[in-house]
Amino acid sequence: MAVDVEFGVAGWWEAAAPLSPSAVAATFTETWPGSERAEPGRIQHPLWPGSSEGLQLLVCFLLLNSCPGGCSDTSAHDGQDQVGVGQLWPLQGFATPVFQHLQVVLQQIIPQGLFWKDDITQDAMIQKMEHASRLHPQEPCLKDGKALFPTKTTESPLAKVNRDQCFTSEVVSKALKQEVANPVKITYRCSYGGLDMMQAPGPSKEEIIYKIMRLLWATSYCGPQPCG
């Protein structure tokens, strides 16, 4: 049985910045292992983000996305042969707005919660989001090149960081909202004696996790500037 998953990755960038024609027309198509055939030009993926593997990949990606300077702190231990939760997410740069928007969108997509109660991811995410809200009750974003909150000089390093944070925050917010408004397009092709039966169920938790990973990858790859 062939399972084709097609994602349009250009639509959500249109809200943030103009793209080249080739980028606008780009689509993401993958054929997963176990299918009957692998058409030329399609990416072969060894792992579909499942209930446990997908969460692990998401956590690892979030760690890499939020760690400045090579993530040296992620190897620190708390003395009990476990990685200290406080060492996982050093919230600097645009990591704070990314996590803030991610939490809001996840709550909107799945009211019952994306992470299982017995999963360490949920506890870590809750603790870090509470920590982020205490450290950054409000981001001093810039509007039309002027600080909304008092700063010594608009050209100071602090203003530069705030400007990058706010730009990235706006891009992530629009991107995630676009994905919520336009759900993942999933098509399962089942062949029974030469008869193709098409089904288009709603996105599952694993598919939503994968979609968010793609969004965060694009954001971290492009940095505070738009791709294209």
UniProtKB/Swiss-Prot annotation:
GO CC terms in record: cytoplasmic vesicle; endoplasmic reticulum; Golgi apparatus
Keyword Endoplasmic reticulum: yes
Tissue expression pattern: Pancreas. Found in alpha, beta and delta cells in the pancreatic islets.
Source organism superkingdom: Eukaryota
Cell compartments where the protein resides: Endoplasmic reticulum; Golgi apparatus; Cytoplasmic vesicle, Secretory vesicle lumen
Pfam families cross-referenced by the UniProt entry: RESP18 (PF14948)
UniProt KW keywords: Cytoplasmic vesicle, Endoplasmic reticulum, Golgi apparatus
Main location: endoplasmic reticulum
Family indicated by similarity: Belongs to the RESP18 family.
Protein task: May play an important regulatory role in corticotrophs.
Protein name, UniProt field: Regulated endocrine-specific protein 18
Native organism: Homo sapiens (Human)
Gene designation per UniProt: RESP18
